[in-house]
Amino acid sequence: MTKLIGLTGGIATGKSTVSKLLATKLPIVDADKIAWQVEGPGQPTTQKIVAHFGQQAVLADGRLNRPWLGQLVFNDAQALQALTAITRLPIQYAMFEAIVAANQQQPDAIILDVPLLFESGWQHVCDQVLVVTASPAVVLQRLMARNHLSQQAAQARIDSQMPLAQKVARADVVIDNGANIDKTKAAVLKWLKTITK
């Protein structure tokens, strides 16, 4: 039977790097990519977001105004709860469809790449959970550079999520994706050998 492996980490820990390494051997169900599809222009979920947050939640072409929404929800817990309430079920449904499709290949395992895996309860369907980690200083630096944020704005985004230490404590496997990519690759390959035939 195909195993479901959860992959998560804190913001800017380098989870996408690990996901790309895993994708060389196993199918990936990427919650972020699915969310972009579910929240695309004209989609029912996008319409519900606009109904709740107003027209400023979308750009002129109908795509979500993600910078505006991000600024809002990372500074307002109630707004984050409202957005999550609108998006959670449609994204979960689309993810289950993607899992069924990936399982048609009969892989050894399917990777569920879910940034908010514990927060959304996906760990309950996983056989194992991998958590990608990096030091707080590295995470802050990466987030500021990647998203062009001030230190204060980056820290607010980090603080809005479950603490990385809690995720690590709940992990079956921890992959350190600090400064050395070669060590990260070695850790991923070592873990893959335990899963793949």
UniProtKB/Swiss-Prot annotation:
<feature type="binding site">
    <location>
        <begin position="12"/>
        <end position="17"/>
    </location>
    <ligand>
        <name>ATP</name>
    </ligand>
</feature>
<dbReference type="GO" id="GO:0005524">
    <property type="term" value="F:ATP binding"/>
</dbReference>
<dbReference type="InterPro" id="IPR001977">
    <property type="entry name" value="Depp_CoAkinase"/>
</dbReference>
<feature type="domain" description="DPCK">
    <location>
        <begin position="4"/>
        <end position="197"/>
    </location>
</feature>
<dbReference type="GO" id="GO:0005737">
    <property type="term" value="C:cytoplasm"/>
</dbReference>
<protein>
    <recommendedName>
        <fullName>Dephospho-CoA kinase</fullName>
        <ecNumber>2.7.1.24</ecNumber>
    </recommendedName>
</protein>
<dbReference type="Pfam" id="PF01121">
    <property type="entry name" value="CoaE"/>
</dbReference>
<keyword id="KW-0067">ATP-binding</keyword>
<comment type="function">
    <text>Catalyzes the phosphorylation of the 3'-hydroxyl group of dephosphocoenzyme A to form coenzyme A.</text>
</comment>
<keyword id="KW-0547">Nucleotide-binding</keyword>
<keyword id="KW-0173">Coenzyme A biosynthesis</keyword>
<dbReference type="GO" id="GO:0004140">
    <property type="term" value="F:dephospho-CoA kinase activity"/>
</dbReference>
<comment type="pathway">
    <text>Cofactor biosynthesis; coenzyme A biosynthesis; CoA from (R)-pantothenate: step 5/5.</text>
</comment>
<dbReference type="InterPro" id="IPR027417">
    <property type="entry name" value="P-loop_NTPase"/>
</dbReference>
<keyword id="KW-0963">Cytoplasm</keyword>
<keyword id="KW-0808">Transferase</keyword>
<dbReference type="GO" id="GO:0015937">
    <property type="term" value="P:coenzyme A biosynthetic process"/>
</dbReference>
<comment type="similarity">
    <text>Belongs to the CoaE family.</text>
</comment>
<keyword id="KW-0418">Kinase</keyword>
